[in-house]
UniProtKB/Swiss-Prot annotation:
Organism: Methanocaldococcus jannaschii (strain ATCC 43067 / DSM 2661 / JAL-1 / JCM 10045 / NBRC 100440)
Intrachain S-S bonds: none
InterPro entries (UniProt xref): CRISPR-assoc_prot_Cas5, CRISPR-assoc_prot_Cas5_N, CRISPR-assoc_prot_Cas5a-typ, CRISPR_Cas5_sf
Keyword Lipid metabolism: no
Protein name stated in the entry: CRISPR-associated protein Cas5
Gene: cas5
Biological role stated in the UniProt entry: CRISPR (clustered regularly interspaced short palindromic repeat) is an adaptive immune system that provides protection against mobile genetic elements (viruses, transposable elements and conjugative plasmids). CRISPR clusters contain spacers, sequences complementary to antecedent mobile elements, and target invading nucleic acids. CRISPR clusters are transcribed and processed into CRISPR RNA (crRNA).
A Pfam family the protein falls into: Cas_Cas5d
Length: 245
């Protein structure tokens, strides 16, 4: 089976992928599969050619078609550590068409600082040149992941070959796939696998090949080579990246 991966180098000043909670929202360390799929699907829609009765219908159909082509979606930090910090957000509602608009609400939310990350899209089969060109153009249209707070831009992107060779795991994997393996560290986080479009979608636990370190009172997260080896690998932007597919 010949597989290829589209790898995009994304740059953010900061981002926040909120966990399911109320008022105090912690952030995931890395963008979830649902955020990555949704961002690529948005790019495909912007390029046109999709029809439907509503934008939600078009988006849902586009995501379904995309998921049929993908076998893996993930992300990793690119030559940088990950740092969390709490920021108080005050969301104003100045545009409400009411004589007595509701008071603005405030909530505490974590933001993550990781200068650059790699978004990895692995396709089940080798795509045609036309399909590859469409995906490439769609990736370059990514300007945010998930919420509007996660504004970023694509620096560069490339297609790479997926090789069935062992290499240290560098990007997250569903925990149930590797739960019986000998795992040396890592961090477990619950993430959405697919955009929910208003429906209740259960979060899945994922293993992130990161370790926590401390400097004085602050915590930061770095990659680890000792979690375990992935069963596939790619080489992208001068990095050898182990995957578990």
């Amino acid at each position: 089976m010949i597989m290829e991966a589209l790898v995009a180098l994304l740059r953010f000043p900061f981002y926040s992928f909120g966990k399911q909670s109320y008022q105090v929202r912690q952030s995931l360390l890395l963008p979830s599969p649902s955020a990555l799929k949704g961002a690529l699907a948005k790019g495909i829609i912007l390029l046109g050619g999709k029809k439907g009765k509503s934008l939600d219908e078009i988006a849902k159909k586009t995501v379904e078609e995309l998921e049929n082509k993908l076998i893996y979606v993930g992300a990793k930090p690119y030559k940088s550590s990950i740092i969390k910090t709490p920021i108080l957000l005050k969301r104003l509602r100045n545009l409400e068409d009411q004589k007595n608009p509701e008071k603005s609400d405030a909530m505490r939310r974590e933001y993550v600082f990781a200068r650059e990350i790699l978004a990895i899209y692995v396709f089940r089969r080798k795509l045609s040149e036309e399909e590859k060109d469409l995906m490439l153009k769609a990736v370059y249209l990514i300007d945010q992941l998930g919420d509007t707070e996660c504004v970023g831009n694509v620096i560069k992107t490339e297609w790479v070959e997926v090789k069935e060779e062992k290499a240290p795991l560098k990007t997250y994997v569903k925990f149930k796939k590797v739960s019986k393996m000998s795992i040396n560290g890592g961090i477990i986080e619950n993430m959405l696998e697919t955009p929910n479009f208003g429906n209740k979608v259960k979060e899945e636990p994922y293993l992130l090949p990161l370790i926590e370190k401390r400097y004085r009172r602050s915590s930061y997260y770095v990659e680890s080579d000792r979690i375990f080896d992935g069963n596939y690998k790619i080489i992208a932007f001068d990095e050898v990246i182990g995957l578990w597919i």
